[in-house]
Amino acid sequence: MINQSIWRSNFRILWLSQFIAIAGLTVLVPLLPIYMASLQNLSVVEIQLWSGIAIAAPAVTTMIASPIWGKLGDKISRKWMVLRALLGLAVCLFLMALCTTPLQFVLVRLLQGLFGGVVDASSAFASAEAPAEDRGKVLGRLQSSVSAGSLVGPLIGGVTASILGFSALLMSIAVITFIVCIFGALKLIETTHMPKSQTPNINKGIRRSFQCLLCTQQTCRFIIVGVLANFAMYGMLTALSPLASSVNHTAIDDRSVIGFLQSAFWTASILSAPLWGRFNDKSYVKSVYIFATIACGCSAILQGLATNIEFLMAARILQGLTYSALIQSVMFVVVNACHQQLKGTFVGTTNSMLVVGQIIGSLSGAAITSYTTPATTFIVMGVVFAVSSLFLICSTITNQINDHTLMKLWELKQKSAK
């Protein structure tokens, strides 16, 4: 029986951890081209290239490290994986504040991907600790913390960076992240992790988890559409700043306009994420994803066609309302399909595959923006969003909460080993 008071306390800490982590990581994202230009005298093409590399860099090392951290969480403690990720992020933010060249910044971003991963660790912890009937709602609310952090980060980033400078801003966030880590060490309580002597004899190999995820139709197809969602989303990141500048015919500063656009997107995401989670709990996950990704694609195309800030703002709001359903739905399918003692391994393995889209999308988006126009980038990525829905539309997957195929595969493996 789950102790509700402990669970509520744990959830608040996880929500706060994700909020601080994402806010700290997103303070620079909308202003990344400006930040790169401040580090070194670069051409427009070089700025876009370095910005794309900087966005993609953490994903490269995350792809390698995420399954390993997930497996360690299942084996040792999911709580300490959350704390490890917070501490790693705090150290990397501190090092970012000391960077003086784009290359140094990219190298630290690689370290961030290797030692960070707060969202993955929190998702694994939450999915193992939460009541089974509320997992969708819990993942939806955790997604709202990501959205809230992504909203607050750019807002405080633009204002604080103008007053204190980028280095002081990063130093401050590093200190706050470290404080949250200490608080989590004192207050976070793990109740579902079994001592090693009581743990069932389950094969927890990373290679085995990849096989199970990719050989099961439901998880495989959801991971594919998740990869495409990340590809499209991250492909638009470096294009937003120049797109906003090109359609800004007002007296408002471009940096402020970008902040308003990001605020609109993430506010919409905060409001909609828990709602999508509740729909998933009611077993509508396939329908939710198909509807949301098509609407998200249409919103991206509309942004590419925008000729003024008002139209661009409306399209950003629509994208925020729908994008919040996507990755949480992928994780919902995965955590409901795997064994209780394998949540971390499967979440880590899934994230390792999802970041492939982040890497390729960041670089592709930067390349398209450099050699065509920002509007073209948004239209291309919108088409990717919409077309990805075909992987679910053309499947035989039904709207169900649990798919126990993965559990059965692990049980068969266990029996054959005896």
Swiss-Prot record:
Instruction: List the InterPro entries hit by this protein, alphabetically.
Output: MFS, MFS_dom, MFS_MdtG_subfamily, MFS_sugar_transport-like, MFS_trans_sf, Tet-R_TetA/multi-R_MdtG-like
**Keywords of this entry:** Cell membrane, Membrane, Transmembrane, Transmembrane helix, Transport
A Gene Ontology molecular function term of the record: transmembrane transporter activity
Q: Which SUPFAM superfamilies match?
A: MFS general substrate transporter
Quote the gene name from the UniProt entry.
sbnD
The phenotype of cells or organisms lacking this gene is:
Deletion of the gene impacts growth in iron-depleted media. Mutant is partially impaired for staphyloferrin B secretion.
Q: Where does the chain cross the membrane?
A: 19-39, 49-69, 88-108, 163-183, 222-242, 257-277, 287-307, 317-337, 353-373, 377-397
Organism classification: Bacteria, Bacillati, Bacillota, Bacilli, Bacillales
What's this protein's function?
Answer: Involved in staphyloferrin B secretion.
Write down what this protein is called: Staphyloferrin B transporter
Membrane-topology descriptor: Multi-pass membrane protein
Family the entry assigns: Belongs to the major facilitator superfamily.
The record's induction entry says: Up-regulated under iron-deficient growth conditions. Repressed by Fur under iron-rich growth conditions.
Q: Where is this protein localized, as stated in its record?
A: Cell membrane
Query: Could you give one GO CC term from the UniProt record?
Result: plasma membrane
